[in-house]
């Protein structure tokens, strides 16, 4: 924010500077245009400034102008006098214009030598007409006091020797100020009359043919404002050698700029002008001789006098008539006034009206310069107001900057504190991340354990299913065995009935045998055949009466009876013999015969009893094998029941743990890490498996303790 404000202020300052530069350029262009309209082209004009002791100085006055036909560098091939002015302009970049509080302005120092030498030369002379730039620079006020405020313009004509014109050496008092670096362009000129001195105050000098006997050097410094950006200041090509028997005020003079200056006409002492119109040339010659000035030619002719003629258009040219004279200086020689003591005589053709016209023009020019000074003063005031506003703006910006800087420092402190807090939070976050990673690892381990337990539960479920299927198979086999046992029992019962019938028959037969034995014994004693018929009928009744006897259920009795019957049959068979021819029972001990049909019945009964005994043995063997098989199945069933009970107890324990975990409060659902690791996680698949297994157990044991415990848990 502060940088944006400062950049905006800088842009405003740059815009003001650009406007000021444009204004300065415009003023410089207007002044250059006005100077070009009021200035006449000259070659080299010279004025003589006479010091109080009579010393003469050659100083350039105003910008040096060439004629319309000459270029910036013009080479003259004719013999002319080399008028040199030594003025080294200061560096444009090292000297700046300083504006004082009282409105004064200082200019750069100008060095002058103490002698004037006009040296003739027959060689080519290159005249550099570039205007010399002397920028405004800082000059001490104390050093400016050593310089004469008013330079004495002394006319070298013989009419007013000793008469001085007081004028301000610089036209700064009239207000000629420039916003840019101004240039001081000194030019020298040789004026033929005092009128031309005033007329050509801008520095446009004429070297007249009638005035070269006594050169007049006018000194005025006009300030021009060339575009310093396009042409920097350069040393002047003119040099002035001032030799005087009495020294000047100082070898190095300094000028002081005044806020106000006296009128130019008042400083020229116009009342003494008539006295200067008729001065004798010898007086002037003596004056010049006593002052120590020397005009000498450098072509070997010795001291000579300058003569010339005025052109028809007014300004004189140094190059006119150069080839008509064998001596280069003869063209400037005047036939009216011979040389006396090496000094050229002067002319006395000054005219007062022309001088007044020139002074009027000069005064108008000074008024213009005064107006320009006022305009520049207004510009200066505006610039000062702008500078004050910029200064106040700068102070406000400085205050704002200080405030912003304080805020920025506070923000930096806040940022540092926040950065430290962020670092602390980052440390906590890192610890939380480590804990989260540990918890993630624990969760992964718990998931793995739960998967392992789920696989174990699934394997147990498969085992339980296989056990259940085996149990069902055994139950079916047991039922089949029981049905077979029942069928065998029924067969045994039927066989027992048949056996009992046979036993009863055997008993009846034994009784009949006894009866028959008794009858045989009686027959042997009585021998009657009628008794045999009676015995047969009685035997038949006995056989029929023995058919309804009860059959004993006990196996040992039947076996005993069987053994008894077999023994009886053996005894009977041994004691009796059946004779098939007679079909009569014959007893060994008795001599009676048994009918054949009876013997056949007895034989059939014996075979039937034998078959029944064999079948009984087979049934006993099958029953014993089935009993052993049933015992083995019962033992296997007991073992499977024991295993199922163990698995049921384990499943009940797992179910109880699951229900206990589900019944834990939400605050206790975040146990310690070690507790989580020690506790066996329960997989989600185990619930369904446990429910299915419990259902099977309830079906298998409808009234057992498992149902009671499971109902309590559920």
Curated annotation (Swiss-Prot):
Coiled-coil positions: 356-525
Region named Disordered: 1-113, 219-261, 288-325, 519-576
Cellular component terms per the entry's GO annotation: cytoplasm; nucleus
Key words, A-Z: Coiled coil, Cytoplasm, Developmental protein, Growth regulation, Nucleus, Stress response
Keyword Cytoplasm: yes
Sequence ranges of Polar residues compositional bias: 36-50, 58-74, 219-253, 288-297, 313-322, 519-561
Comp. bias (Low complexity): 562-576
Expressing tissues: Expressed in root tips, emerging lateral roots, shoot apical meristem (SAM), vasculature of cotyledons, leaves, sepals and carpels.
Observed phenotype of the null mutant: Pleiotropic phenotype with defects in cotyledon, leaf, flower and seed development, slow growth, severe epidermal defects, including loss of cell adhesion, outgrowth of cells and increased cotyledon cell size.
Domain of life: Eukaryota
Entry keyword annotation includes Transferase: no
GO-annotated biological processes: cotyledon morphogenesis; flower development; leaf morphogenesis; positive regulation of cell division; regulation of DNA-templated transcription; regulation of growth; seed development; trichome branching
Cellular localization per UniProt: Nucleus; Cytoplasm
Biased composition (Basic and acidic residues): 8-33, 92-102
Assembly with partners or alone: Interacts with CLF.
Function: Is required for normal leaf, flower and seed development and controls cotyledon and leaf patterning by inhibiting premature differentiation. Regulates the expression of a subset of PcG target genes. Is required for the repression of the floral specific genes PI, SEP2, and SEP3, but also for the activation of FLC. Involved in response to cold. Involved in the regulation of COR15A, COR15B, BAM3 and AMY3 transcripts, and ascorbate levels in response to prolonged chilling temperatures.
Name of the featured protein: Protein BLISTER
Organism: Arabidopsis thaliana
Gene transcribed to yield this protein: BLI
